[in-house]
C-alpha cells in the first residue's frame, strides 16, 4: 500500500511512476475523493463542535431554570446531521482505501522500463550448459523411468497439475529441501520457522494477495464451522505467513535485520495459465518451496536484496546448475515489488533458462498494510520496516533441473555431491 500522503501531495509524480509499469492511475477520481474528504472532515468537526457547544448551553439553561426543550431539539437535529456526515465520511474513506489497495507498488528508479519479460535485462550468467553425446530426455521421462513420478496416480487422487513421487525421486525431493534449509540456517543466518499452511484474510491483505488476487488462491470453508474465522486460504508461498509474523508489531532496531526461512507446500490455482506447461512439474497446483524473508531498516533494504538474491544463487552454485540472473522490467514485476531479480536455471530438454527463484524488495508496501514498524534507537520514534522475500529455491523446479542436468546416457541420474550426505551416500538413482 502506498503512502497516503504521497497520494495526496505528490499525485502527479506517483501517476508517472505507476505509468512506467503500465498502470493508469485515475488522478481525477483521487483528487475528487480527496477534496470531498476534506469537505466532510471539516463538516463533521464543525457539527461536533456546534453540538458540544449547544449541549453545554442546555446545562447552563437548566441551572437557570429556563425551558431547555428548544435547545434539546436543536442538539438532536445536530446529532442526526453529524451521524449522517460521519457515515458519508466513513463510506468515502473506505472507497479511498479500497482504491489505494488496488494500486501496485512504485518501481525503484534502478528498474528498467518495459512492457513484459522481453524487456527484462540479463545481469549475469553462472556455469556452462553441459554438452550431451546422447538424446536428452525431459524430467517426466526420466522420473517415470526411475519409477518415481506418477502423474496418473495424482489424477486419480485429485486431478491435473498434481504429482505422486515415490522411492528415490521422493527421497531426492526431500534431500533438496533439507539441503536448502541447512544452507540458509547454518551459513546464511536465517531462523527456520514452521508456519500454518492455512491463513486468514487479514494475513493475505498484509502481504498483498487480497483483495486483488483472490482468484489465484485456494479458499476453504469447513462445513462444520460456520464463522468468520473459518474463512481460510491455503498459502501460495511461505512469504505470506513469514512476513505477517511482524504484522502489528514494533521491533527494536537492534533486532534488525530479521531473517526467516521455511519449507512449505505452496498452493496456487494458476488462474489464467490454462494450457501453459501442462507436462511435468513446472506449473503445479501444489509444490514445495524453501522461502527466505528479510525484515530490514529502510536504508538497508537494497543491500539486503543483493544479499538475499546471492543466497538463492548459492544453492544453484553448490548444486552446480547453470543459471542466469535477470533484472525484471517495470511491466514484469509483481504487484507489491519495488525491484525484483529472477534466477533462471538451465533446462536441457527445453534448451532454455526457466525461472526457479524470484527475489524482491517490497520496500514499505507490505509494512504499511501490516503496520509493521521498528523503534529507532536514537530518537525512539517508530518507522515502517522494509520487507523482502525470495525463493531459496522452488524445490520441484530444482528437482527438474537436477534430473535433466545430471542425466546419464543409460537414463540414470547422478546425485550432486552436496546431496549425497542427505541420500545415504547414493551416487546414482534410477
Curated annotation (Swiss-Prot):
L-serine binds at residues 237-239, 291, 391. Its main location: cytoplasm. The keyword ATP-binding applies. The keyword Glycoprotein does not apply. It catalyses: tRNA(Ser) + L-serine + ATP = L-seryl-tRNA(Ser) + AMP + diphosphate + H(+); tRNA(Sec) + L-serine + ATP = L-seryl-tRNA(Sec) + AMP + diphosphate + H(+). ATP binds at residues 268-270, 355-358. Its EC number is 6.1.1.11. Keywords: Aminoacyl-tRNA synthetase, ATP-binding, Cytoplasm, Ligase, Nucleotide-binding, Protein biosynthesis. GO terms for biological process: selenocysteine biosynthetic process; seryl-tRNA aminoacylation. One of its GO terms (molecular function) is serine-tRNA ligase activity. GO terms for cellular component: cytoplasm. It comes from the Bacteria. It is found in: Cytoplasm. It is an enzyme of class 6 (ligase). InterPro entries: aa-tRNA-synt_IIb (IPR002314), aa-tRNA-synth_II (IPR006195), aa-tRNA-synth_II/BPL/LPL (IPR045864), Ser-tRNA-ligase_type_1 (IPR002317), Ser-tRNA-synth_1_N (IPR015866), SerRS_1_N_sf (IPR042103), SerRS_core (IPR033729), tRNA-bd_arm (IPR010978). Catalyzes the attachment of serine to tRNA(Ser). Is also able to aminoacylate tRNA(Sec) with serine, to form the misacylated tRNA L-seryl-tRNA(Sec), which will be further converted into selenocysteinyl-tRNA(Sec). Consists of two distinct domains, a catalytic core and a N-terminal extension that is involved in tRNA binding. Homodimer. The tRNA molecule binds across the dimer. Belongs to the class-II aminoacyl-tRNA synthetase family. Type-1 seryl-tRNA synthetase subfamily. This is Serine--tRNA ligase. It comes from Yersinia pestis. The lineage of its organism: Bacteria, Pseudomonadati, Pseudomonadota, Gammaproteobacteria, Enterobacterales.
Amino acid at each position: 500500500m502506498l503512502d497516503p500522503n504521497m497520494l495526496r501531495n505528490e499525485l502527479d509524480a506517483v501517476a508517472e511512476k505507476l505509468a512506467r509499469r503500465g498502470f493508469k492511475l485515475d488522478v481525477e477520481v483521487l483528487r475528487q475523493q480527496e477534496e470531498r474528504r476534506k469537505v466532510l472532515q471539516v463538516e463533521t468537526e464543525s457539527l461536533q463542535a456546534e453540538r458540544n457547544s449547544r449541549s453545554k448551553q442546555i446545562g447552563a439553561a437548566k441551572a437557570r431554570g429556563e425551558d431547555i426543550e428548544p435547545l434539546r431539539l436543536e442538539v438532536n437535529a445536530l446529532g442526526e446531521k453529524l451521524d449522517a456526515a460521519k457515515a458519508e465520511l466513513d463510506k468515502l474513506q473506505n472507497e479511498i482505501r479500497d482504491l489505494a489497495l488496488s494500486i501496485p507498488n512504485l518501481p525503484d528508479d534502478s528498474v528498467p522500463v518495459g512492457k513484459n519479460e522481453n524487456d527484462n535485462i540479463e545481469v549475469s550468467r553462472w556455469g556452462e550448459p553441459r554438452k550431451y553425446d546422447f538424446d536428452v530426455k525431459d524430467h517426466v521421462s526420466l522420473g517415470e523411468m526411475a519409477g518415481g513420478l506418477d502423474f496418473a496416480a495424482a489424477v486419480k487422487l485429485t486431478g491435473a497439475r498434481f504429482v505422486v513421487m515415490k522411492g528415490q525421486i521422493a527421497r531426492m525431493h526431500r534431500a533438496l529441501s533439507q539441503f536448502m534449509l541447512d544452507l540458509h540456517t547454518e551459513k546464511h543466518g536465517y531462523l527456520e520457522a514452521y508456519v500454518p499452511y492455512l491463513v486468514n484474510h487479514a494475513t493475505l491483505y498484509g502481504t498483498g494477495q487480497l483483495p486483488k488476487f483472490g482468484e489465484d488462491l485456494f479458499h476453504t470453508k469447513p462445513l462444520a464451522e460456520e464463522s468468520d474465522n473459518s474463512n481460510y486460504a491455503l498459502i501460495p508461498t511461505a512469504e505470506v505467513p513469514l512476513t505477517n509474523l511482524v504484522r502489528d508489531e514494533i521491533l527494536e532496531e537492534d533486532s534488525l535485520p530479521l531473517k526467516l526461512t521455511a519449507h512449505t507446500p505452496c498452493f496456487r490455482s494458476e488462474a489464467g495459465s490454462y494450457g501453459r506447461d501442462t507436462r511435468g512439474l513446472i506449473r503445479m497446483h501444489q509444490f514445495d518451496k524453501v522461502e527466505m524473508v528479510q525484515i530490514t531498516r529502510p536504508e538497508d533494504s537494497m543491500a539486503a536484496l543483493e544479499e538475499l538474491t546471492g543466497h538463492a544463487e548459492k544453492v544453484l552454485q553448490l548444486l552446480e546448475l547453470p543459471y542466469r540472473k535477470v533484472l525484471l522490467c517495470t511491466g514484469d514485476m509483481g504487484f507489491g515489488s519495488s525491484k525484483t531479480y529472477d534466477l533462471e536455471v538451465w533446462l536441457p530438454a527445453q534448451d532454455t533458462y526457466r525461472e526457479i527463484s524470484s527475489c524482491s524488495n517490497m520496500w514499505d508496501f507490505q509494512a504499511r498494510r501490516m503496520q509493521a514498524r521498528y523503534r529507532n534507537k536514537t530518537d525512539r520514534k517508530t518507522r515502517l520496516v522494509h520487507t523482502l522475500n525470495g525463493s531459496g529455491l522452488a524445490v520441484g523446479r530444482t528437482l527438474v533441473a537436477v534430473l535433466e542436468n545430471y542425466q546419464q546416457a543409460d537414463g540414470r541420474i547422478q546425485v550432486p555431491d552436496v546431496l549425497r550426505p542427505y541420500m545415504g551416500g547414493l551416487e546414482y538413482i534410477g
